[in-house]
Structure formats: structure tokens, C-alpha cells
């Protein structure tokens, strides 16, 4: 049994087309729907994303993901955390790059995730394959006392700590730690290293990505 992620715009019937997709960001309900627009439009008041109705399912998903990063920054007011007029949702080039990297979650050949485990054994961000290892016991603890993991972007490794100070770390914290390190990987591979300096922003994205993907996950025998 393996965890996979379903493209919500991919119809189950070949003769049909998915015209709208609903999902949550935090406590907010958003609807992404096809419309007669040239470029993707976001209405933050009505919480509606309008996507060019000529796009296929893969392109529609790409636009949804791009909008997702923008909406997270807006709804959680992450821009206030960035100095010197930089933006938490980054510029258009970085946004496109992040969306491209994140879209790999919908290709099950780019990650190895067994059913009923907290996180995958490995995953790909662009051309870089990251492998995830559990560390049984360490004396290291972050200053926040919440995240228990570390990323090595040169070797493509993520270490998740299982025990600290002789106490088991709960599954929920290990899961959050993985997504936290995953967001670090996204920012690094998108050449947006400065975003890694603000742990609150990384954690905010990590939480929302985890919830976003959870809404579109399924399981297959593989």
C-alpha cells in the first residue's frame, strides 16, 4: 500500500471535465474554478480562484498551486515578517519555480511513501532527490523547542529526530518537522535562500502544505 496524491482537476470520466475544485487554507474555504479569463485571477473577498478554462488538468493544477502560495502569504499576513519590502509570496519568477517544484507531489514516481507512515522515504524537488532518515536519539534541540529535524541540501538528506532528552517525539511533531524541512528544500532549490531565515514563515507554509496535500491524498496497492 502506498500514499499517492490525486490531481483534483483530473476527471474520473474521460468524457467529463472538472470545472471547479474546493479546498481549505487554514479555516478558509476556497474554490478554484474554470472561467473565461486569460490569466489566473484571485478574489480574496469571495475566496474564488478563476483559472483559464482552456487549460488541461495538469496546467489547471499548476495554476492552483501558484495561487495557493499567494493565498497562504495573504491570509496569514506573512509579508509582515519580511524586511526590506520583500514578499513572503516572493516574486513571479520564484512563484513559478516553487509551483513547478511543488507540482512533483502529483507524480508518484518522484516520491516513495508507504501507507500509514508519517512521511515518505524519499522525494524529488526538481532534479534533487532527498532521502529521509530517522535519528534515534540526539542532544540537539531547536531554539523554538518545536522542530526536531535538519536538512542537508548538498547531500540531499533530511534527518527526523525520534527521541530527544530520552523522550519519544510524538508522531504529529515528526510529521510537522518533515514538512518544515520540505519547505526549506523548496526555498533552497528555488534559490530563495533568504526565506529560510524566518522560521515562522517556513513553518506557516509547512502547515498549510501538509493540510493542502492531505485533502487530495489517496492510497493504492503498489
Which residues fall in each region the model found?
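Basic/hydrophobic alpha-helical interface regions
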Residues: 2-3
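Active-site scaffold of zinc-dependent metalloenzymes
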Residues: 9-62, 74-91, 109-172, 188-189, ...
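Active-site recognition of the HExxH zinc-binding catalytic motif
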Residues: 62-75, 176-188
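Long, highly charged low-complexity segments enriched in Glu/Asp and Lys/Arg with interspersed Ser/Thr
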Residues: 104-105, 214-219
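Long, well-structured alpha-helical subdomains associated
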Residues: 109-110, 219-222
Amino acid at each position: 500500500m502506498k500514499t499517492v496524491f490525486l490531481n483534483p482537476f483530473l476527471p474520473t470520466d474521460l468524457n467529463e471535465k472538472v470545472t471547479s475544485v474546493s479546498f481549505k487554507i487554514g479555516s478558509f474555504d476556497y474554490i478554484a474554478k474554470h472561467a473565461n479569463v486569460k490569466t489566473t485571477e484571485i478574489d480574496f473577498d469571495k475566496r474564488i480562484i478563476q483559472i483559464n478554462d482552456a487549460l488541461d488538468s495538469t496546467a489547471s493544477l499548476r495554476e492552483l498551486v501558484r495561487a495557493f502560495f499567494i493565498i497562504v502569504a495573504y491570509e496569514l499576513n506573512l509579508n509582515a515578517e519580511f524586511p526590506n519590502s520583500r514578499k513572503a509570496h516572493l516574486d513571479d519568477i520564484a512563484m513559478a519555480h516553487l509551483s513547478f517544484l511543488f507540482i512533483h507531489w502529483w507524480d508518484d514516481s518522484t516520491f516513495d511513501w508507504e501507507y500509514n507512515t508519517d512521511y515518505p522515504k524519499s522525494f524529488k524537488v526538481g532534479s534533487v532527490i532527498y532521502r529521509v532518515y530517522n535519528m534515534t536519539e540526539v542532544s540537539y534541540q531547536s531554539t523554538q523547542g518545536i522542530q526536531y529535524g535538519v536538512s542537508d541540501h548538498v547531500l540531499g538528506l533530511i534527518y527526523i529526530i525520534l527521541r530527544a532528552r530520552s523522550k519519544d517525539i510524538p508522531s504529529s511533531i515528526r510529521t510537522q518537522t518533515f514538512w518544515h524541512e520540505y519547505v526549506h528544500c523548496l526555498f533552497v532549490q528555488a534559490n530563495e535562500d533568504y526565506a529560510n531565515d524566518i522560521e515562522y514563515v517556513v513553518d506557516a507554509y509547512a502547515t498549510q502544505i501538509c493540510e493542502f496535500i492531505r485533502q487530495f491524498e489517496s492510497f493504492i496497492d503498489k
